């Protein structure tokens, strides 16, 4: 059985998925996890742009505080055996001194100091703490790159949809993208 939780109802048919309308920061989440004896929690509600959440403070509250509330709910319920958390490759940073490829053992050259990258870095720290406190729960962290596709609206997709894409002559940055169908 699959239960979807969000503040926004689904746009279309979601088949056999049960839907609960709730904010990630609400105690309702803990009640749903306990009542339904949830064994796997998939946390995908990390917001990357402040405009979608009502500004930077609201974004941080949803991302970091919301994740902390979810982890606290998972900690209390012994039926939870697997936690999947969506993160981002931005936690690695974008230094010109960075290697072309990162491994899971590598960290950023410097800690992100603002925005989405900082939120993701903090969230990953809280998730690692949860994993130490609940070694019986298998934790999976998905570090996704920028999502692109015909149905994605973001500053990056707007940039690439321009009739002429401005670039800096002689600058060829490394970029990674994830197609929306792969997320």
Language model features with spans:
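Conserved cofactor-binding/catalytic machinery of classical short-chain dehydrogenase/reductase
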Residues: 40, 65-69, 108, 122-123, ...
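Active-site Tyr-X1-5-Lys
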Residues: 111-140
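NAD(P)-dependent short-chain dehydrogenase/reductase
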Residues: 130-182
